[in-house]
């Protein structure tokens, strides 16, 4: 399974299915691609209705025929545009083409519907994308129920957890490997991933990627 960080919170997961999470590309100064270059996608996941997460999700779904998995209120909007959707809510699970997607708690705000994180099970791997969130004890449930092989955790502070809270989130979620996200896209979310890695220590393997770089999860 190949994991590519597209900048900000946008992730591409290439396995038996092609999955995009929070594909904010247009207007993203850190983006490593553009939506018009994406011609293959099976599932697009959106964690919440902020522009830097909902991003280009509708366009990608319309261009590729991908199924949009997201909170109910966004799903209703997308369905009205002819997009295939799987709407859900926190605590729920959907299965799309053999891929299990669980929606979990996030502490944040949103324009429409509630913010969320997601846990994705595919090809024998379990991935946790926290979305935009503060540190919350609910992350302990992610660890207890799912034991993620790889987690994507925001570290940019101000609008999400900063480095100290994200370090604790690694512990709570029992993450084996972590890719920091949602940092250094804009001046207001500047953070040092090296400092994050140092503070995590031997709790987990921290993988620092540049936008466009990939990591093979085995």
What are the functions of these language-model segments?
Residues 1-18, 25-28, 95-98, 102, ...:
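Zn-dependent metallo-beta-lactamase
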Residues 21-22, 41-49, 68-72, 128-132, ...:
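Active-site neighborhood of phospho(di)ester-bond hydrolases with catalytic His/Asp-centered motifs
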Residues 16, 108-172:
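Active-site-proximal loop/helix segments of hydrolase catalytic cores
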Residues 27-28, 50-55, 75-78, 93-95, ...:
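Active-site environment of divalent metal-dependent phosphoester hydrolases
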Residues 1-5, 24-32, 84-85, 131-133, ...:
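Short gly/ser/thr-rich secondary-structure transition/capping motifs
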Residues 79-92, 167-218:
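Binuclear metal-ion centers of metallo-dependent hydrolases, dominated by the metallo-beta-lactamase
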Residues 10-50, 55-59, 73, 109-112, ...:
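Pre-active-site segment of Zn-dependent metallo-hydrolases
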Residues 47, 55-112:
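Glycine/small-residue-rich loop that forms an oxyanion/phosphate-binding "nest" at active or ligand-binding sites
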């Amino acid at each position: 399974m190949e994991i590519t960080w597209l900048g900000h919170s946008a992730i591409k997961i290439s396995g038996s299915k092609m999955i995009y999470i929070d594909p904010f590309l247009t207007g993203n100064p850190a983006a490593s691609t553009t939506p018009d270059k994406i011609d293959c996608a099976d599932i697009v996941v959106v964690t919440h209705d902020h522009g830097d997460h909902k991003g280009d999700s509708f366009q990608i779904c319309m261009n590729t025929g991908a199924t949009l998995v997201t909170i109910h209120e966004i799903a209703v909007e997308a369905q009205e545009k002819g997009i295939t959707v799987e709407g859900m809510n926190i605590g729920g699970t959907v299965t799309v083409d053999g891929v299990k997607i669980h929606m979990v708690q996030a502490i944040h705000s949103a324009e429409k519907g509630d913010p969320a994180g997601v846990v994705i099970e595919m090809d024998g791997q379990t991935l946790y994308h926290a979305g935009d969130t503060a540190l919350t004890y609910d992350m302990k449930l992610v660890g207890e129920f799912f034991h993620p092989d790889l987690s994507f955790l925001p570290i940019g502070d101000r609008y999400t957890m900063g480095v100290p809270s994200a370090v604790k989130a690694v512990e709570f979620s029992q993450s084996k490997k972590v890719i920091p996200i949602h940092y250094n896209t804009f001046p207001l979310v500047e953070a040092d991933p090296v400092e994050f890695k140092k503070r995590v220590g031997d709790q987990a393997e921290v993988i620092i990627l540049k936008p466009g770089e990939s990591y093979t999860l085995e």
